[in-house]
């Protein structure tokens, strides 16, 4: 079971919660699970900080999630708060705002609304649902809205 767990952790970054779930699925007892997880951590197959960094990078770049949604997902995986904070600090602020602006611009062209107020409400709900902070979303919606006014 230990070798199986090592192979499982070698294929991609895993957190303790994922490994425990898989070991449980394989029928390991809590004592065996604890020993295997400790071994995997000692041999650096599992590293919470490394997992957190990879998770943040992937969800932010590829899934275009905001900090709030990423943080929530990491909490669901029982990652310590200090490790989450450290991982979220790796996000480049300029790139973060560019991703948010791009999402809002794409969505703005597809949203059907009678008034600008209604359109902005839909855009804000969309971006907040993606996990971006409300302040950043409102700022971005206003900025992209101003750009549209100048283009007309």
Language model features with spans:
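An alpha-helical, amphipathic repeat domain used for nucleic-acid recognition
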Residues: 1-152
């Amino acid at each position: 079971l230990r070798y199986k767990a090592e192979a499982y952790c070698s294929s991609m970054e895993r957190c303790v919660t994922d490994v425990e779930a898989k070991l449980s699925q394989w029928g390991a007892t809590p004592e065996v699970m604890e020993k295997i997880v400790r071994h995997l951590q000692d041999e650096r197959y599992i590293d919470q900080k490394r997992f957190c960094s990879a998770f943040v990078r992937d969800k932010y770049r590829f899934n275009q999630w905001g900090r709030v949604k990423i943080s929530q997902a990491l909490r669901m995986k029982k990652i310590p708060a200090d490790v989450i904070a450290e991982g979220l600090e790796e996000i480049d602020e300029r790139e973060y705002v560019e991703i948010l602006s791009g999402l809002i611009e794409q969505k703005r062209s597809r949203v059907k609304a009678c008034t600008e107020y209604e359109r902005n409400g839909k855009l804000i709900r969309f971006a907040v649902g993606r996990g971006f902070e409300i302040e950043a979303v409102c700022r971005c919606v206003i900025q992209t809205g101003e750009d549209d006014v100048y283009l007309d």
